[in-house]
Amino acid sequence: MAKGQSLQDPFLNALRCERIPVSIYLVNGIKLQGQIESFDQFVILLKNTVNQMVYKHAISTVVPARAVSHHTASDRPQGERPQETTEE
C-alpha cells in the first residue's frame, strides 16, 4: 500500500462498511451525494438512485453526514504497531 493511502483507505472503508451517507464535492464545484458502495486506487463507486463511478482525481472533498471512527486496531495491517511517542 502506498504511504499516501494509509489514511485514505481506512477512512473510505469505514464510510463504506458503516453505510454512512456522504457528500462528495468535485473540483468543478459539483456536489454529489450518496453512499460509498466500493472504491479502489482510482475511483469511488457512489450509490444513490443510480450508481456513479467518480474518479478520485476529480474529487475535492468527501464530507460524511456524521462522525466516523476510522483509526482502530483492526484497520492496521497485521504486525504493525501504533506509533509511540517518546519524551526526551
Curated annotation (Swiss-Prot):
Positions of the Sm domain: 9-68
One GO BP: regulation of translation, ncRNA-mediated
GO CC term, one of those recorded: cytosol
Region (Disordered): 66-88
InterPro entries on file: Hfq, LSM_dom_sf, Sm
A GO MF label: RNA binding
Pfam families: Hfq
UniProt cross-references to Gene3D superfamilies, sorted A to Z: 2.30.30.100
Record bears the keyword RNA-binding: yes
Compositionally biased region (Basic and acidic residues): 72-88
Origin: domain of life: Bacteria
Alphabetic keyword roster: RNA-binding, Stress response
PANTHER family listed in its UniProt record: RNA-BINDING PROTEIN HFQ
Family affiliation: Belongs to the Hfq family.
Main function: RNA chaperone that binds small regulatory RNA (sRNAs) and mRNAs to facilitate mRNA translational regulation in response to envelope stress, environmental stress and changes in metabolite concentrations. Also binds with high specificity to tRNAs.
Subunit-level organization: Homohexamer.
NCBIfam families hit by this protein: Hfq, PRK00395.1
Protein name per its UniProtKB record: RNA-binding protein Hfq
Species classification: Bacteria, Pseudomonadati, Pseudomonadota, Gammaproteobacteria, Vibrionales
